[in-house]
Design a protein with these regions (language model features):
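Acidic, small-residue rich beta-repeat scaffolds with periodic aromatic anchors
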Residues: 1-68, 158-221
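Hydrophobic beta-strand segments that make up the repeating blades of beta-propeller
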Residues: 115-121
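Beta-propeller blade termini
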Residues: 36-37, 52, 97-108, 150-163
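Residues in Ca2+-coordinating acidic/glycine-rich loops
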Residues: 40-43, 106-114
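A contiguous binding-surface segment within folded domains or other stable secondary-structure elements
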Residues: 121-154
Length: 221
């Protein structure tokens, strides 16, 4: 059973990995280990994520000293007790320039329970993430494909909204805003800038349907 710390004031919001990691190299085939420690909250214990990755030199550009990284496994512990291990298949991931794979921990369903994400692909214009969220019944993290959409994802904890921005090439950009309704993600706003006619168009959820509510000059010209 997980031990919960109910006497702390830490708010579970997205936590960037760069402030809380340690790293060590292991001799096996260019593998390395990054450890990410996150504090306890009222609903989650303090956790240590031990991420094992493999790096290989980028042989396509001899002029750059650059490495690509692939995730191997993720070991999750609390108070030194293993609660879960995830084994990754390299074929499910594109080469990543980041050795931490953009790891981020946060309350991605705004329910007080933790979750984490890592990059699945960062090679194109829009990153793609894999998400896991805490399942209180299973006492483990489970894959959460509802959030696995292409684009840059930002969690607005004040408004409990999820904002996704993506580029379609050229001046075309799309900005999506989601909210949860009974644990289901609902698209409540869609902004296209610029559309084929060079306009910025705003669509909002009205009576269960996205409807065009505003058309202005593009802000990206």
């Amino acid at each position: 059973m997980l031990k919960m710390d109910t006497a702390n004031n830490y708010d579970l919001e997205s936590t960037n990995v760069l402030d809380i990691t340690t790293m060590e190299m292991v001799s096996d085939s260019g593998k390395y280990i990054k450890r990410i420690n996150v504090p306890a909250t009222d609903q989650m214990p303090a956790l240590c994520f031990e991420l094992t990755g493999r790096k290989e030199k980028d042989d396509y550009n001899e002029n750059l000293s650059r490495f690509f990284h692939y995730p191997d496994k993720l070991l999750i512990t609390t108070d030194g007790i293993i609660i879960q291990q995830l084994d990754f298949d390299e074929n499910d991931f594109s080469p990543c320039a980041l050795d931490d794979f953009g790891f981020e921990y946060g309350d991605f369903r705004f329910d007080g329970y933790g979750g984490f994400k890592i990059l699945c692909s960062s090679m194109g214009k829009n990153p793609v993430w894999k998400f896991w969220v805490w399942d209180e019944n299973k006492k483990s993290f489970v894959n959460y494909p509802d959030l696995e959409m292409a684009g840059y994802i930002n969690f607005d904890y004040n408004n409990q909204e999820i904002n996704v921005s993506s580029s379609g090439g050229g001046d075309l950009h799309e900005f999506l805003t989601y909210k949860y309704d009974n644990d289901k993600l609902i698209l409540i706003e869609k902004v296209i800038d610029a559309d084929q006619d060079g306009k910025r168009k705003v669509f909002k959820l009205i009576d269960g349907e996205l409807q065009l509510t505003e058309t202005t000059e593009s802000q990206l010209k």
